[in-house]
């Protein structure tokens, strides 16, 4: 049976159980119990999450934690775009050289600006912007194209349906039904790119 590793943030944690159900009998699907966080954290954990597991396929994303602008950080993204691009390339090259897995990159899902801003205003912690989602995805997909890494465009899946119809009201996270739609797209990408 094919072994699959899912790496990503809380969006991945939301769709992972449904991907496991969709691929039951086809693939053993595993993902870290923890949120993958930003690209630097993902790279720091790839030896545990990917190298030592040696799966057949890795479906991976990071971005929402990279592009967040912390209120205590002067309004700059936690991981600025040029640094994010550097780390995305390092992540993909690491997976290529340290695993035998097929790799699928997933784009970062959209942010509803007003809802996200209202949610985080309660905590005075950080903001996210949909314009940054588009910019960060643009850099990541260009790197994937250059390296020959297929992309599962979850951003496009959500935009086609309408983020407001899938999200739970906080501008970022998904309802169970929304996560089910993402899970279907992830399962389809895994089936399409499974090693032959």
PLM feature segments, named:
Residues 7-9, 34-38, 81, 128-129:
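Short, flexible loop segments at the rims of nucleotide/cofactor-binding pockets, characterized by
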Residues 1-17, 38, 67:
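Catalytic nucleophile-elbow at a beta strand-turn-alpha helix junction centered on a G-D-S/GDSL motif
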Residues 26-42:
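A short beta-strand-loop structural module common to alpha/beta enzyme folds
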């Amino acid at each position: 049976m094919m072994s699959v590793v899912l790496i990503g943030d809380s969006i991945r944690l939301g769709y992972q159980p449904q991907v496991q159900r969709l691929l039951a009998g086809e693939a053993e699907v595993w993902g870290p119990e923890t949120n993958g966080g930003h690209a630097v954290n993902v790279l720091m954990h790839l030896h545990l999450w990917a190298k030592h597991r040696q799966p057949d396929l890795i479906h991976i994303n990071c971005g929402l934690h990279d592009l967040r602008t912390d209120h205590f950080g002067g309004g700059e993204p936690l991981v600025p775009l040029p640094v994010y691009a550097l780390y995305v390339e390092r992540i993909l090259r690491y997976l290529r050289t340290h695993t035998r897995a097929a790799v699928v990159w997933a784009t970062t899902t959209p942010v509803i600006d007003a809802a996200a801003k209202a949610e985080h205003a309660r905590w005075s912690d950080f903001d996210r912007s949909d314009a940054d989602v588009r910019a960060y995805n643009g850099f990541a997909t260009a790197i994937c194209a250059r390296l020959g890494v297929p992309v599962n465009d979850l951003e496009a899946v959500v935009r086609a349906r309408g983020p407001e119809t899938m999200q739970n009201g906080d501008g970022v996270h998904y309802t169970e039904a929304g996560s089910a739609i993402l899970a279907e797209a992830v399962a389809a990408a895994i089936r399409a790119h499974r090693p032959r």
